[in-house]
Amino acid sequence: MEWTDIFSGPAFEPVKSRELHLGKDCDLSRPLVVRDTDKLTVEVAGGAALRLVVLHTKPCQAEIRIKLLEGADAELVQLFSAEAFVDFQVEQAAGSKFRMTACQFTSANVRYRFDLNGREASNELDVLFLALEQDHCVVDLRTNHLVPDCTSRSLIKGVASGTGRGEFCGLVYVAPDAQHTDAQQQCRNILLSRTSRIDARPQLEIYADDVRRWGRWRMKRSSICVSAV
């Protein structure tokens, strides 16, 4: 039994459609599961709540688009057990909430782009990647704060062993009028061999005056720990 078979059980609702539209009266008693899609478009209406699991169990290239209307709520889990190249974009209207956990258990290349287009939108992302032996894991993240009063938090954790390689490039962009932005970004990594490597490139591009921002990266190899804030 594969661990992904858990999501074939009665606690989950399989979905084969490439397009999902959740109205405010939509009642989802079970989380939805999308497996090995190459294209997925999701729209969540205000007052609706999406719970979605996205599985990548076969090598593929995928494009995922999610649009949260005003007051919508979404919680996602994304799991990789096969190499995949994924372009993942989210657009958020005012008062919407987006939370996501992603785990790369093998080589993968994922580009995340989050656009916070409405006031008081919130965005949370947690990513774990395991670059073992000869694996190559890439996380490319851009979070765009385009209006005032939005919050974002991203935490990226990586582990590399053998000749495994990990890459993280994260940009937080704050537009000129996006006052009272609260943006947090962290990257913490562990190297288990002298031949493994993880490159972390956190970036800030801020054009507003009243911004709360916090960034940290940490790399650990054996008993040596280096950190910068």
PLM regions and their residue ranges:
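Conserved beta-strand/loop scaffold segments within soluble protein domains that form the structured core
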Residues: 13-228
